[in-house]
Amino acid sequence: LKKGLMLNVDYRLRTPNSYQLKTKSGKWGMIAYSNEIHSVMIGYKRGRFTGGIDSSGWVKENPEKWEKLQDIAVWNESAFKKANIEVYNKQKAFCDNHIEPEYRIGGGIFTTLSANRYHIGQSSKMGAHVDSGDLNAGMTTMSCFREGDYDGAYLVFPRYGIAIDAPDNSVIIADSNQVHGVTQIEGKGQGYRSIPEITVR
């Protein structure tokens, strides 16, 4: 956000962590901006303007990597089923009834995968937020990978006073409809998070 812009004049908050700019026509822009984070959306999503469902640009540009990344969704789905079969069955029923198999990663219960990287140079933390577009009845899974040594980068849920320091090659299962964020990372290492989810928007 540029210096000198005034709240509710030049921009307005869409969420506590994102904002919309006023366009030259005097209307609020359709795109919401937020703090920069090294992240990419991978998988299937409905087009913002067309309404059609298609694979993301990243998938089209990286077909070999896409084939390998789909394994993350399979492992996360297995962990989800083992951890909470009741919620898993609700999420699977939603997918079976409302989402065609060709728009699910590996034919499973997830439609998209967000890949985030945290390191001190860029994307060192993520502000508190609620994931928009996630299935209300479901839960989100997160694969966590570590490269090198670092402290911080805890997944936090402020409402519950919880901060999770995820070990390498672990899966976290949580409700992304609750306010959450990632604390500041410290050190030379990097943290990678892959989050398969159902996007319903």
Regions found by a protein language model. Give the residues of each.
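Fe(II)/2-oxoglutarate oxygenase catalytic core
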Residues: 1-141, 164, 186-201
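Contiguous, well-ordered alpha-helical segments that form the cores/surfaces of helical PPI scaffolds
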Residues: 137-146, 170-173
